[in-house]
């Protein structure tokens, strides 16, 4: 997808590759911050799949430290999960769940990225990490998941060196501006925000009926200005 000033991934097309080669040895060439940022997507896949989340909690620190076996397992399982989801809903046409589930954490994350300007101050994975924790917090507030899940996610993300809360960032954000960004997210329908929420690891779902005031209150409680 192509980023615009209005938001992330707003322009794009569907063209499937003939072959995907994943040479995990090349991960050793990444700066540590970039490798940690990539882990946010693995953690997301873990929260979507359940068993992978348990593995992430146990092996995440080793993976971001560059352990070849841990990295290979993370890449393999992430590709396996994403391929299955995309094959079942290639063009994201499913009304419920489907490919949209891969956007767990991204509604919040894309808004944060857009506010920061895509200049490298906040990497995509760092924004997604914070988005995962916020999505879990929103889920808990709405009564969908256990109250301890957000803290468990934050603990894991901090444990691998990722930001997980808005207070981890050096600047403050406006709740109103972030919500305005989320209304323009590619998952939005007629200006209504859609989120991927969770009932627990392995039990994620899409929701288009989240009250905007609940989102704004969450953001203010997390440290945003009004």
Description of each model-found segment:
Residues 19, 25-26, 38-45, 55, ...:
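Alpha-helical scaffold segments in soluble metabolic enzymes
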Residues 32, 36, 49-56, 68, ...:
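Alpha-helix initiation and N-capping motif
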């Amino acid at each position: 997808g192509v980023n615009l000033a209005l938001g992330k991934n707003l322009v794009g097309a569907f063209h499937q590759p003939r072959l995907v080669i994943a040479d995990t040895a090349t991960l050793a060439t990444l700066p540590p911050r970039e490798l940690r940022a990539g882990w946010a997507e693995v953690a997301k896949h873990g929260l979507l799949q359940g068993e992978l989340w348990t593995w992430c909690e146990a092996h995440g620190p080793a993976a971001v430290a560059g352990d070849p076996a841990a990295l290979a397992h993370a890449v393999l399982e992430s590709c396996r999960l994403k391929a299955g989801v995309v094959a079942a809903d290639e063009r994201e046409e499913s009304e419920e769940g489907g490919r949209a589930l891969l956007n767990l954490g991204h509604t919040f994350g894309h808004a944060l990225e857009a506010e920061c300007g895509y200049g490298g101050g906040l990497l995509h994975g760092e924004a997604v990490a914070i988005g995962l924790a916020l999505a879990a917090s929103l889920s808990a507030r709405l009564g969908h998941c256990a109250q301890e899940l957000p803290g468990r996610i934050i603990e894991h993300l901090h444990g691998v060196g990722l930001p997980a809360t808005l207070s981890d960032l050096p600047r403050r954000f406006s709740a109103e501006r972030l919500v305005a960004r989320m209304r323009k997210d590619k998952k939005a329908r007629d200006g209504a925000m859609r989120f991927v929420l969770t009932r627990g690891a392995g039990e994620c779902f899409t929701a288009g009926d989240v009250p905007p005031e609940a989102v704004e209150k969450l953001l203010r409680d997390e440290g945003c200005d009004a």
